[in-house]
Amino acid sequence: MDTFAALKSLSLAYGPPGREKEVRGLFKGYVNGLVDEVFEDTSGNLIVKRYGQHKGTVFFSAHMDEVCFLVSKVLPEGFLRLEGIGADVKLLPSQKVWIHTRSGKRLRGVIGMLAPHLQTEETRKKLNGFEDLFVDVSMSDFSEISVGDFVTYDNEPFSTGDFFFGKSLDDRACGVIIVKMLERLTALRHDFDVFAAFSSREEIGAFGARTAAYALQPDIGIALDVTHAIDTSPNYPKNEFGKGPVIAVGAIPHRKISNLLIETAKQNGIPYQIEPSPSRTGTDTDQIQLETVAAGVVSLPLRYMHTPYEQICVKDIDETARLLALFVSALKEGVV
């Protein structure tokens, strides 16, 4: 797999919660020849299976959906109002966006607001809310745009050195990790069967991962998601670029799974980081563990989460894939 090319295609793909078809098609192509089964379930997950020696099952999940917006109102003046799904309203003025109509057309627009010259002193000090913003699509006929149409960022991803910038790296970059793990497993013996879900609708509650875990009933489940790469603030865990995967420890991650991930990293010289997780993880794991699965979380450091330009380090993708492939090959019957 050409990691940078895959990241670019995935970043550009359209995939709000429940509308992941384009992303699903990309991942279906990436896993071709690496798995024994691949299918789409009724929740919109892409499920893949690679069989080992049937001594147990380990399940990985990485979500395909992205933060986005919905058209909430079409104004008589010819502008659109929005509601957000996971987006930070402070970042939105002047952002280019795509409006995805029900007929399948894409229309370009720009998020605007009242110019500073026209604002009062009070409104200039006020943080923007969605009620202060609108989408200008410069059209006189709005008949093709409907309330409920999805709106996504329109921006061009790019790379510099080992770093990649673009939208929707949360969590499609972790889908790339699954693919690269599967590539490595072609050269490794593994007793456990490997199931994976490129999951749907995580940004609104991780519903896809829950239905997949319920249907597959694995022994072990690991969510792959992004976490905050914070290099400067002493008030947060110091997750850094280029220092490898981040392994969660805490209330929800199963202790045996976290410990085995850590031991696998140590034994194979893989750099890793630890992140405390005192309550819910905010990942697919919160739903996977509800199905009585021994669950863990492995995260990819990322800056600028839920913005038009998220940032990751590709070295961390490679090290995480290496860790997970060796973790799978180390699993033995009765490990949990």
Name each region found by the language model.
Residues 1-336:
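N-terminal hydrophobic/helix-forming segments and targeting peptides
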